[in-house]
């Protein structure tokens, strides 16, 4: 299996054992990576929800060890996506995830249904 990129929404769904999380097989998770922007986004949501920061980082590092640094290339790609994604209300975190997928030429997984309306040159898979 080739590399796949996970959005923060997928990470949160996995950690909270939400519907659709069962689609994240061991094989898929073994090839998964996440942008450091989305890693921070997921950690922030968990900590804001009352989780212990130390436990949050231990879980994220255990389940999602492959975090890709947000580079100038990713920044450029994320900025280029603004016009295409504005109507869908995608955040910087969303565009950062898509930028990583585009840079890696890898499929991306999200729980955000609006992403299926995008045509950014990489496959978009919905968790649910």
Question: Which residues does each predicted region cover?
Answer:
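Short, hinge-like loop/turn segments at secondary-structure boundaries
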Residues: 49-53, 85-86, 125-128
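Acidic, PIN/NYN-like endoribonuclease modules and their adjacent C-terminal/linker elements
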Residues: 1-3, 41, 98-128
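Amphipathic alpha-helical segments within well-ordered protein domains
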Residues: 43, 61, 79-82
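Short, well-structured N-terminal submotif of metal-dependent ribonuclease cores
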Residues: 1-34, 46-58
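Helix-loop "lid/cap" segments that line or gate small-molecule binding pockets
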Residues: 42-47, 64
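Active-site neighborhoods of divalent-metal-dependent phosphate/nucleic-acid chemistry enzymes
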Residues: 66-109
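Alpha-helix capping/helix-boundary segments
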Residues: 10-11, 38, 74, 96-97, ...
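Short loop->beta-strand "edge-of-pocket" segments that line small-molecule binding or catalytic clefts
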Residues: 4, 30-33, 63-67, 107
């Amino acid at each position: 299996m080739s590399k796949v990129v996970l959005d923060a929404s997928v990470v949160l769904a996995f950690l909270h054992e939400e519907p659709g999380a069962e689609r994240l097989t061991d094989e898929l998770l073994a090839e998964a990576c996440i942008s450091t922007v989305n890693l921070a986004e997921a950690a922030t949501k968990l900590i804001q929800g009352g989780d212990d920061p130390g436990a949050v980082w231990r879980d994220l590092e255990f389940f999602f060890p492959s975090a890709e640094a947000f580079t100038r290339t990713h920044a450029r790609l994320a900025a280029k996506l603004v016009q295409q994604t504005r109507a869908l209300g995608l955040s910087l975190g969303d565009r950062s995830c898509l930028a990583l997928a585009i840079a890696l030429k890898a499929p991306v997984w999200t729980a955000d249904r609006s992403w299926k309306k995008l045509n950014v040159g990489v496959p978009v898979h919905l968790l649910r």
